[in-house]
């Protein structure tokens, strides 16, 4: 039995609230159960120096967590003078995931930055951030199209992410913190709406997992991403 009493293939309640930030070109408050992430999309005319003159744009991301997003207060990274390795890893993952479904040539020589701020953490913050960031990116690109900055929304597909793991010997979908903190195996899957795999991050916390177990988790993740993409489609109409 899972602590949340969910079925093994049951996700937490997922919701998207669009347009929650007045000044951002796109924004979304995404909730995976008690994990809440606020994502804002900012359009900028500047590009990284190494991209200038190449006729294409860039999509990048930043990730942070409010001090009391967690059970015990987490010190702000700005007070330490540097980002943790975890933060850098997550924001690079978010950026890679969004770029995988964005037509950067059609975007033109512009940069869109997705700021992902965790308001409350209960496991799966990176997967929620990726899934909500797609909504914020879509709204930013829609804003651009309305102003004739792009002819069409330069998105090639949806992208969403979900965690899977082995908890008490059972493969389960969308781990919350109570499961994630003691799971034998924990993995994150980033996939497109058409089923393409963008990234898999998997770790055996106790004993190594088998190829069959990995394929089982992949199947579970695919069903979860299909549900998330369906909710994204409903959210953007």
UniProtKB/Swiss-Prot annotation:
GO biological process: rRNA catabolic process; rRNA processing; tRNA processing
Parts of the chain that traverse the membrane: none
InterPro entries hit by this protein: ExoRNase_PH_dom1, ExoRNase_PH_dom2, ExoRNase_PH_dom2_sf, PNPase/RNase_PH_dom_sf, Ribosomal_Su5_D2-typ_SF, RNase_PH, RNase_PH_bac-type, RNase_PH_CS
Top-level EC class: transferase
EC number: 2.7.7.56
Role played: Phosphorolytic 3'-5' exoribonuclease that plays an important role in tRNA 3'-end maturation. Removes nucleotide residues following the 3'-CCA terminus of tRNAs; can also add nucleotides to the ends of RNA molecules by using nucleoside diphosphates as substrates, but this may not be physiologically important. Probably plays a role in initiation of 16S rRNA degradation (leading to ribosome degradation) during starvation.
Species the sequence originates in: Xanthobacter autotrophicus (strain ATCC BAA-1158 / Py2)
Protein name per its UniProtKB record: Ribonuclease PH
Positions that bind phosphate: 86, 124-126
Single GO MF descriptor: tRNA nucleotidyltransferase activity
Subunit structure: Homohexameric ring arranged as a trimer of dimers.
Superkingdom to which the source organism belongs: Bacteria
Alphabetical list of SUPFAM superfamilies matching this protein: Ribonuclease PH domain 2-like (SSF55666), Ribosomal protein S5 domain 2-like (SSF54211)
Pfam families: RNase_PH, RNase_PH_C
Family, similarity comment: Belongs to the RNase PH family.
NCBIfam families in the cross-refs: RNasePH
Assigned keywords, A-Z: Nucleotidyltransferase, RNA-binding, rRNA processing, Transferase, tRNA processing, tRNA-binding
UniProt catalytic activity: tRNA(n+1) + phosphate = tRNA(n) + a ribonucleoside 5'-diphosphate
Keyword Iron-sulfur: no
